[in-house]
């Protein structure tokens, strides 16, 4: 293990993880696999008694704390970007919750999956800004889609993917089978199989407000501006009363 290898590992981590600590595929399974890869790298460093063995400790903790938030009240994960619940039990069991001395407070999300949680409710909101980078090659056409669970039951969901390989996950990526908003049965994102988006909203904007009674998520995108002269906006008003 030399400085070049360590530098490359840092480069990969910096380019694949967003500032909140989420893998830029915005797929919980891929996120979990990346955490496991970092843990394996640390184990290799420790085996060779490398002084850089703890270099990814902060990132592992950051990513694990985000993963800890990605569960609905029924124990399932949100089905964004081809996720599925085949490995949910393994993902949940991999979390060592004893590492968290206090609950992490997440700063405002400006790009990614925004979420709200209380004792009985969980809300996820897709405000990911698609791009042409290869890291986006698994993103679905689900801008402004949402998931909601409450009192142990999933209420709104996305299509996800029934398996990890084959044509079905790819088909579902570019279908409109997401809880998003469309005009005249047209999709805002053009996706080619096994590639990043060809056409996508150039601007996805997210705003979050809080008051004593409500948490407000508001997202918008310009994917229909050129063809329909419309800005699409979705506003979620969440009652913060735990019993509602």
Give, region by region, the residue ranges found by the protein language model:
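Active-site lining segments of carbohydrate-active enzymes
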Residues: 1-27
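Short, charged, low-hydrophobicity "junction" segments
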Residues: 11, 95-101, 191-194
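Residue-level preference for alpha-helix termini and adjacent loops
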Residues: 16, 22, 76-79, 170, ...
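Carbohydrate-active enzyme catalytic cores, enriched for enzymes
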Residues: 18-159, 211
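Non-catalytic C-terminal accessory modules of carbohydrate-active enzymes
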Residues: 104-244
